[in-house]
From Swiss-Prot:
Keywords: Amino-acid biosynthesis, Arginine biosynthesis, Cytoplasm, DNA-binding, Repressor, Transcription, Transcription regulation
Function noted in UniProt: Regulates arginine biosynthesis genes.
Molecular function (Gene Ontology), one example: DNA-binding transcription factor activity
Descriptive protein name: Arginine repressor
Pathway: Amino-acid biosynthesis; L-arginine biosynthesis [regulation]
GO biological process: L-arginine biosynthetic process; protein complex oligomerization; regulation of arginine biosynthetic process
Species name: Chlorobium phaeobacteroides (strain BS1)
Chief subcellular location: cytoplasm
Entry annotated with the keyword Methyltransferase: no
Amino acid sequence: MSKQIRHRKIKEILLSSTVTNQHELILLLEKRGIDVAQATLSRDCSELGVLRSRTASGYRLMIPEDNPGQMIKGLVEMEIQSIESNESSIVIKTLPGRAHGVGSFIDHLKNPGILGTIAGDDTVLVIPSSVHDIRSILDYMQTNLLNN
């Protein structure tokens, strides 16, 4: 089964059904003749921008329809509490349990000045490609992670 077909089926299911978690999505895909490992489904959901959103009846997996990048940026903005730096790195403090999502968002921005991120529970360590780029990375983060 090609990734393209799997992605299309995932979109169809999420747009037509209330799906509360990935396990349920796997079962719905299996009913449609698509066998997929949980790790593969997790990657597919990430690539499609699938969000787990709270609704009046509980949680639901959803595909954002209007400008998903802007929607995710809005969520990231709400999760960041502070951004600080020293002469060698940048530390982002987030709401508890949200550092992984913020770190992943930063990684997906693919800024060449950022070597990578390491996320804990409420802290993201941003490692610059060069310590000489700290100021420009901070400016970049102000523009791309926070409300201006």
